[in-house]
């Protein structure tokens, strides 16, 4: 358990304590309560240096006051986006006001057919973004901007039957392997800090918008040259939908949503810790600025009132600021996974779980046998896919919460998996001992077969 007490030194608090301590001691020196001056001086030192859950006493007083002021006010909404053309003809970037910052968004496109292997609780994949690279690009091309790297997604879905979801949660355990995850870079421009850069392009807000649009385009291009597929956003719709928590009211330790609760945390363990916590929805934010240490926060949404996971620290009194990116905690540079880990397809010879994403491109999936078919369809349903099977699979569909149709398929919002031949799209082969993709012709795996899954195979037509 984390020690709630800590020490923090700052020049301002040290000067204030050193200035007040001598008068306190002198004031009581000639009285019978001479010890009171020493006690007051000691109390001042404690107030100036000792923290409780990351804040001094003065910080807690300020947090309570700020929370009382804003708790009955609805959160500030972002302005309507405006699309501004860059110097490239036909290339557009949407910008909008978010508080006092003008922002633009860059979507990171996942690399298709990228497996994730979990080794000792750590996710290994080559679909990653180095936060240090983002800081380096900002330092070179736009040192007066800062960037928020925001990932949003979920470990398991909610479209399948509850028994199916519960079983899949047991199978994957605490693997940091979200079934769905999308990542954006939000570039933030402070009008005061960027005044000189903006004035080189135009006067006032027009110059600021042009500078931000050009910077977003340049950062996206440089990321692509480093192997990270990035596209400037023409709207904020997908980002807003992925990060919406249905805000209703801020409480001291959580945010009440329309039908769920969201809590903001500090978690120094990095993405492997962030994505291993059980939650219905997860949002992570890492802020990067040239010459400054990265800062992060994690928001976990659950149907019931949240309990703090191990390795996490609740940001009491700062839930709404954390949601809006105003209350972040210092962290270190790390490698951030970009896309979904996907569906559990097997394990390595060393019993390390292997996950494969199927939610980014359309494919025709060839499944080796009835058990492989059952496992993939059941796990895909638990991972949030909409499963459609033929009329002869009526009992199977009822058990897992699937639909009945003429075409057998597994559909995600941005991709459809056809369980059979389909012209014009890539073909993937999944067997009990191998998975073959356009990127990995023969990736050896071993089957993971929890006994509880066998009852779904028994529901298949004979």
Task: Name every feature range the model reports, one short phrase each.
Residues 47-142, 340, 344-345:
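N-terminal topogenic membrane-targeting module
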Residues 169-170, 174-462:
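Membrane-proximal, solvent-exposed terminal domains/tails of membrane-associated proteins
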Residues 114, 129, 140, 152, ...:
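Amphipathic, interface-forming alpha-helical segments with heptad-repeat character
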Residues 132, 136-145, 381, 387, ...:
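A short, charged
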Residues 1-80, 430-462:
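N-terminal alpha-helical membrane-insertion module
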Residues 2-4, 113-117, 363:
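Short small-residue beta-strand/loop micro-motif enriched in glycine and branched aliphatics
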């Amino acid at each position: 358990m984390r020690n709630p007490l800590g020490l923090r030194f700052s020049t301002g608090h040290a000067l204030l304590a050193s200035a007040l301590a001598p008068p306190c001691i002198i004031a009581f020196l000639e009285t019978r309560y001479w010890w009171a001056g020493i006690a007051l001086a000691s109390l001042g030192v404690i107030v100036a240096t000792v923290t409780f859950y990351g804040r001094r006493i003065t910080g807690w007083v300020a947090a309570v006051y700020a929370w009382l002021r804003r708790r009955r006010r609805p959160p500030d909404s972002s302005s309507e986006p405006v699309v501004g053309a860059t110097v490239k003809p036909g290339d557009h970037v949407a910008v909008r006001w978010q508080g006092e910052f003008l922002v633009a968004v860059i979507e990171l496109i996942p690399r298709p057919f990228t497996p994730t292997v979990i080794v000792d609780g750590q996710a290994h994949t080559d679909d990653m973004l180095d936060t240090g690279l983002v800081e380096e690009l900002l330092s070179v091309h736009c040192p007066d901007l800062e960037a928020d790297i925001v990932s949003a997604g979920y470990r398991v879905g909610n479209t399948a039957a509850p028994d199916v979801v519960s079983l899949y949660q047991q199978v994957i355990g605490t693997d940091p392997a979200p079934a769905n995850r999308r990542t954006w870079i939000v570039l933030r421009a402070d009008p005061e800090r960027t005044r000189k850069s903006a004035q080189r392009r135009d006067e006032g807000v027009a110059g600021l918008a042009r500078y931000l649009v050009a910077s977003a385009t340049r950062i996206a291009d440089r990321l692509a040259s480093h192997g990270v597929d990035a596209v400037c956003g023409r709207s904020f719709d997908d980002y807003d939908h992925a990060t919406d928590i249905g805000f209703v009211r801020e409480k001291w330790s959580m945010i009440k949503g329309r039908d769920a609760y969201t809590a903001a945390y500090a978690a120094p363990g990095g993405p492997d810790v962030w994505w291993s916590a059980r939650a219905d929805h997860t949002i992570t934010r890492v802020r990067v600025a040239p010459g400054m240490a990265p800062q992060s926060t994690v928001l976990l949404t659950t149907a019931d009132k949240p309990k703090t996971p191990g390795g996490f620290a609740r940001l009491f009194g700062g839930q709404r600021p954390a949601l809006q990116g105003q209350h972040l905690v210092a962290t270190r540079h790390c490698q951030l996974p970009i896309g979904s880990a996907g569906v559990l397809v097997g394990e390595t010879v060393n019993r390390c779980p292997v996950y494969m994403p199927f939610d980014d491109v359309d494919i025709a999936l060839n499944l080796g046998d009835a058990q492989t078919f059952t496992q993939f369809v059941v796990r895909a349903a638990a991972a949030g896919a909409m499963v459609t099977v033929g009329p002869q699979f009526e009992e199977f569909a009822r058990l897992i919460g699937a639909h009945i149709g003429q075409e057998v398929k597994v559909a995600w919002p941005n991709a459809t998996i056809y369980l059979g031949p389909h012209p014009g799209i890539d073909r993937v082969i999944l067997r009990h001992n191998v998975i073959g993709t356009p990127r990995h012709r023969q990736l050896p795996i071993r089957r993971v077969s929890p006994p509880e899954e066998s009852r779904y195979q028994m529901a298949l037509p004979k």
